[in-house]
């Protein structure tokens, strides 16, 4: 949640987008609650990656730590001081990248039923959309496994758009993949993307 949500101005000039209340509850708080509801074990830690302290100050940090404590988890704060993409943001939380983990974009607002199979090596949650060319989409094989991940395809690949929630049985594998992306300086649009790390795991 290190970005500033410029597409939602003027609301986000004073409130970071993930903290904007929807039906009285901040987006990120509802997201954490939803994830806690589908995880089949206690959540030990919620790591928040936030931006510049000038925009994400002490009051916001306190609010985020309370969101974690409300579900019985330890809250950890990491900083991404410059917008360098989702892949880079995840690596800012490097000390927390081990064991099973859910990665979620803090401004994800999807009201849907979803479940988590802890036996799966990894899961990417998707949603059918009418304009797949505007999203990152996945292609599935006959068994429902992901075979391809394409960002804003120019030609039709599928209508299953990635919603920004991922599960990894061992997030250390994503960490290693993203580290190689950073080492190789694999940049798209001036940023390091999580998708480039995930593609190395498919």
Locate the predicted segments by residue.
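Short, hydrophobic/glycine-enriched beta-strand segments
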Residues: 1-3
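Short N-terminal binding/cap micro-motifs at the start of the first secondary-structure element
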Residues: 5-10, 133
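Conserved N-terminal catalytic core of the sugar/cofactor nucleotidyltransferase
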Residues: 7, 13, 20-21, 25-103, ...
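The conserved acidic donor/metal-binding loop of glycosyltransferases
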Residues: 106-109
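Catalytic-core segments of class I nucleotidyltransferases/pyrophosphorylases
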Residues: 145-202
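Short, well-ordered beta-strand micro-motif
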Residues: 21, 139, 167-169
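Short acidic-glycine loop/turn motifs at beta-strand connectors
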Residues: 139-145
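Conserved donor-nucleotide/metal-binding helix-loop-beta segment in metal-dependent transferases, i.e.
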Residues: 111-134
